[in-house]
């Protein structure tokens, strides 16, 4: 499933860079698109604002098909306290903008599966696909608005995975 998870993340990352090139994060001295995988980073004291954070939650396997299909639930968490220039009063607009970006990043609902353990990445035989994100309600914590969206990511296991 690691190849599917990596391919899903890289697809969202490249799509975000095209949709909103201004949404970035400085991470380990490098500016990159504002999306990251929580399990691949050092632990946070608090999640970064105005960044999409991917969390992998649960794994399922269907062995009754001709090929083994695996599925893992992905939660995408994001939050905003607005901008300083508006004193944070635009935090709702900022969160809505991130909602729209997430909807756009998720489409189309598939991407080629690549093996990122090799340089350059190797294209595999199958695709990674997912369903529409299901959005949770907005959580309010003082000046911070946050939301999470969940979706299932699917992939057929290939030989050697």
Give the ranges of each region predicted by the language model.
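Charged, amphipathic alpha-helical segments and their flanking helix caps
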Residues: 1-161
């Amino acid at each position: 499933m690691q190849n599917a998870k990596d391919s899903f993340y890289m697809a969202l990352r490249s799509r975000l860079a095209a949709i909103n090139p201004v949404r970035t994060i400085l991470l380990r001295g490098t500016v990159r698109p504002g999306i990251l995988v929580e399990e691949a980073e050092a632990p946070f004291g608090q999640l970064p604002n105005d960044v999409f954070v991917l969390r992998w939650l649960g794994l399922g396997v269907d062995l009754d098909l001709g090929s083994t299909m695996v599925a893992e639930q992905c939660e995408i968490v994001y939050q905003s306290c607005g901008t300083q220039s508006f004193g944070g009063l635009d935090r709702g607009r900022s969160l809505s903008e991130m909602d729209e970006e997430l909807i756009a990043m998720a489409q189309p609902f598939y991407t080629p599966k690549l093996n990122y353990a090799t340089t350059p990445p190797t294209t595999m035989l199958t695709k990674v696909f997912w369903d529409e994100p299901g959005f949770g309600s907005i959580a309010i914590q003082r000046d911070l608005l946050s939301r999470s969206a969940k979706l299932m990511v699917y992939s057929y296991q290939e030989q050697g995975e």
